[in-house]
Amino acid sequence: MDMAWQMMQLLLLALVTAAGSAQPRSARARTDLLNVCMNAKHHKTQPSPEDELYGQCSPWKKNACCTASTSQELHKDTSRLYNFNWDHCGKMEPTCKRHFIQDSCLYECSPNLGPWIRQVNQSWRKERILNVPLCKEDCERWWEDCRTSYTCKSNWHKGWNWTSGINECPAGALCSTFESYFPTPAALCEGLWSHSFKVSNYSRGSGRCIQMWFDSAQGNPNEEVAKFYAAAMNAGAPSRGIIDS
């Protein structure tokens, strides 16, 4: 009787172990937090050198999740990548637009966002970033350089009119200054893409926040940041569940 009971326990343990290991391909292992690419529309499956990365994306050329062609498209006013038009409320100021290009380069090219990658139920991507700790100076400069440009929405992630094939302001949405829609730097950096970023209290060079801008000749400072947060997660942080947006 005891032998039969022990055999039953072993069988149940084997079944539970098998079920736990049979995860879908899109699932990201808890330890898979460093040097990884998102499972998204234009990302490579693995980071690798890209010597021909264009313009503002060039800091990632030593190790990138984006291709050279993707980096070129990111610099266009309306690229074929997402058919997204920065100039939906008139011409965006160049000093403002450079921040959006840099934001796009970070999103598409960085292999150091693993600790903040989450699974999503979306047709065009299986993963997104959530609450990436953006260095406070990068956010403040972004807001300062864009406060006099114009937009019609405080969340650019959803709610656009796509009937023409590119994003247009939804009915009733008025074009006004960024400062009207984003009264603070945090309102811009955190609200713009549904909390992809969270403004950090840490400064650039601290090793505790992600830098949108960096000099690649001095190395990529975001590698150290990713390692710090990955170690914290592996030490016992919350689970990485599936979210809807």
From Swiss-Prot:
<feature type="disulfide bond">
    <location>
        <begin position="139"/>
        <end position="189"/>
    </location>
</feature>
<feature type="binding site">
    <location>
        <begin position="157"/>
        <end position="162"/>
    </location>
    <ligand>
        <name>folate</name>
    </ligand>
</feature>
<protein>
    <recommendedName>
        <fullName>Folate receptor gamma</fullName>
    </recommendedName>
</protein>
<dbReference type="GO" id="GO:0035580">
    <property type="term" value="C:specific granule lumen"/>
</dbReference>
<comment type="function">
    <text>Binds to folate and reduced folic acid derivatives and mediates delivery of 5-methyltetrahydrofolate to the interior of cells. Isoform Short does not bind folate.</text>
</comment>
<feature type="binding site">
    <location>
        <position position="196"/>
    </location>
    <ligand>
        <name>folate</name>
    </ligand>
</feature>
<keyword id="KW-1015">Disulfide bond</keyword>
<dbReference type="InterPro" id="IPR004269">
    <property type="entry name" value="Folate_rcpt"/>
</dbReference>
<dbReference type="GO" id="GO:0015884">
    <property type="term" value="P:folic acid transport"/>
</dbReference>
<dbReference type="GO" id="GO:0009897">
    <property type="term" value="C:external side of plasma membrane"/>
</dbReference>
<feature type="disulfide bond">
    <location>
        <begin position="89"/>
        <end position="175"/>
    </location>
</feature>
<dbReference type="Pfam" id="PF03024">
    <property type="entry name" value="Folate_rec"/>
</dbReference>
<feature type="binding site">
    <location>
        <position position="107"/>
    </location>
    <ligand>
        <name>folate</name>
    </ligand>
</feature>
<dbReference type="GO" id="GO:0016020">
    <property type="term" value="C:membrane"/>
</dbReference>
<feature type="signal peptide">
    <location>
        <begin position="1"/>
        <end position="22"/>
    </location>
</feature>
<dbReference type="GO" id="GO:0035036">
    <property type="term" value="P:sperm-egg recognition"/>
</dbReference>
<feature type="disulfide bond">
    <location>
        <begin position="152"/>
        <end position="169"/>
    </location>
</feature>
<dbReference type="GO" id="GO:0007342">
    <property type="term" value="P:fusion of sperm to egg plasma membrane involved in single fertilization"/>
</dbReference>
<keyword id="KW-0675">Receptor</keyword>
<keyword id="KW-0964">Secreted</keyword>
<feature type="disulfide bond">
    <location>
        <begin position="57"/>
        <end position="105"/>
    </location>
</feature>
<dbReference type="GO" id="GO:0007155">
    <property type="term" value="P:cell adhesion"/>
</dbReference>
<keyword id="KW-0325">Glycoprotein</keyword>
<feature type="glycosylation site" description="N-linked (GlcNAc...) asparagine">
    <location>
        <position position="161"/>
    </location>
</feature>
<feature type="disulfide bond">
    <location>
        <begin position="37"/>
        <end position="65"/>
    </location>
</feature>
<dbReference type="InterPro" id="IPR018143">
    <property type="entry name" value="Folate_rcpt-like"/>
</dbReference>
<dbReference type="GO" id="GO:1904724">
    <property type="term" value="C:tertiary granule lumen"/>
</dbReference>
<feature type="disulfide bond">
    <location>
        <begin position="135"/>
        <end position="209"/>
    </location>
</feature>
<feature type="binding site">
    <location>
        <begin position="124"/>
        <end position="128"/>
    </location>
    <ligand>
        <name>folate</name>
    </ligand>
</feature>
<feature type="disulfide bond">
    <location>
        <begin position="66"/>
        <end position="109"/>
    </location>
</feature>
<feature type="glycosylation site" description="N-linked (GlcNAc...) asparagine">
    <location>
        <position position="121"/>
    </location>
</feature>
<dbReference type="GO" id="GO:0019898">
    <property type="term" value="C:extrinsic component of membrane"/>
</dbReference>
<dbReference type="GO" id="GO:0038023">
    <property type="term" value="F:signaling receptor activity"/>
</dbReference>
<dbReference type="GO" id="GO:0005576">
    <property type="term" value="C:extracellular region"/>
</dbReference>
<feature type="disulfide bond">
    <location>
        <begin position="96"/>
        <end position="146"/>
    </location>
</feature>
<keyword id="KW-0290">Folate-binding</keyword>
<keyword id="KW-0732">Signal</keyword>
<comment type="similarity">
    <text>Belongs to the folate receptor family.</text>
</comment>
<dbReference type="GO" id="GO:0005542">
    <property type="term" value="F:folic acid binding"/>
</dbReference>
<feature type="glycosylation site" description="N-linked (GlcNAc...) asparagine">
    <location>
        <position position="201"/>
    </location>
</feature>
<feature type="binding site">
    <location>
        <position position="103"/>
    </location>
    <ligand>
        <name>folate</name>
    </ligand>
</feature>
